[in-house]
Every structure is written in structure tokens, then in C-alpha cells.
Amino acid sequence: MAKNYYDITLALAGICQSARLVQQLAHQGHCDADALHVSLNSIIDMNPSSTLAVFGGSEANLRVGLETLLGVLNASSRQGLNAELTRYTLSLMVLERKLSSAKGALDTLGNRINGLQRQLEHFDLQSETLMSAMAAIYVDVISPLGPRIQVTGSPAVLQSPQVPAKVRATLLAGIRAAVLWHQVGGGRLQLMFSRNRLTTQAKQILAHLTPEL
């Protein structure tokens, strides 16, 4: 059966968007607020009608992820910021495979996310309460699967009270995108053997987005 590279590319961009946001948070203490909202909201939507619907139904919501994906796919340098993004992206893929193969882990994750939906009736998605709740899910359900993702950045930033919770919540969004990626036919071999196909698809999607003003 032919693979749907449109859906695969969108889901992969979702993983890369989380990786980029984690990087921004770890180095600067803040990140692209709109992209963060899209990524965090993707955790909550358990029954989307399509791959694009997971990310709010608009390709523009994944602009950060698509641009990051192109950087990861075409990284000539294995050092510096691009290497960080590649490491985060691949680490999320590895953890997703461990999540999917761990008995009962996906059910536990689903139950915990249902709890988030109840909290959303009283708190905003980016409130400290929700961030802490999402971070706790990552710590309780994802971290024990190992290996842990080593987040690198500014020590002063990473020691501030709110940033670690935001980073973990964003990593949880990355896991959600990685689950989706596998569901639509994604696999790590594509990063080696279908790189050109993925690059072309990402460029095509970006080409018909309205330019940022």
C-alpha cells in the first residue's frame, strides 16, 4: 500500500515543532506562543478527524515544525543547534516506540489525558496548573520508559521554576506527534531512505502558506 507522505510529513513536523520549542525554552526561557498552543492542544484532542485536525486543521499551525524538519533533514552539520534538534527528534521517536510496546502504557496515558480534559473546563491550556499536570504525565508515564532526553540550554533558564514544566509538557506533545507519525505510516528508515520525498513534501506545504509579515 502506498504511503501517504502528506500525513507522514505533517506528523513529523509535529515532532520537530516540539523539538524546536523545547530548544527555545531551554535556551531563552520562552518560545513561539502560537506554535506552543498548537502543540499542547494536540495532546488534548483524542479523536481527531484527520492528521491535520490534530494540529488545529491548518497547515500554517505547523510552520515552525515544517521549517525545523527541513533543517533536520538537510543538516550538514552534526554540531550546535541543529544537532540538538536532531537529537530531540530522534529521542522522541525512540520513546514513542517504548511507549507503544510497554504493556498498558498507552492506556495509562489515555486515562491521564482524559483528566486533563476535565481540568480544561476550569483552567486555560497554558496556565501553570495545566502545564504542571502535563509535565507530571510526562514524568510519570514517559520518563520511566527511558532513555531520558537530556535537554541542554542555559543553566539559569533551566533552573527557573516554570521552564522545566513547560519543557516536559512540550516533550509530551512531541510524544503525541510521534504516536500519530507511526499511526499514519511513519518509520525511522524514512529519515534515511525517503529524505528527498519528505523534503519535497515539506517544501510544497510551506510554499502555499501565506508569508509571515
From Swiss-Prot:
It is a peripheral membrane protein. Keywords: Cell inner membrane, Cell membrane, Coiled coil, Cytoplasm, Membrane. Pfam families: DUF489. Residues 79-126 form a coiled coil. The keyword Cell membrane applies. GO terms for cellular component: cytoplasm; plasma membrane. It is found in: Cytoplasm; Cell inner membrane. It comes from the Bacteria. The keyword Coiled coil applies. Signal peptide: none annotated. InterPro entries: HflD (IPR007451), HflD-like_sf (IPR035932). Belongs to the HflD family. PANTHER family: HIGH FREQUENCY LYSOGENIZATION PROTEIN HFLD. This is High frequency lysogenization protein HflD homolog. It comes from Shigella boydii serotype 18 (strain CDC 3083-94 / BS512). The gene is hflD.
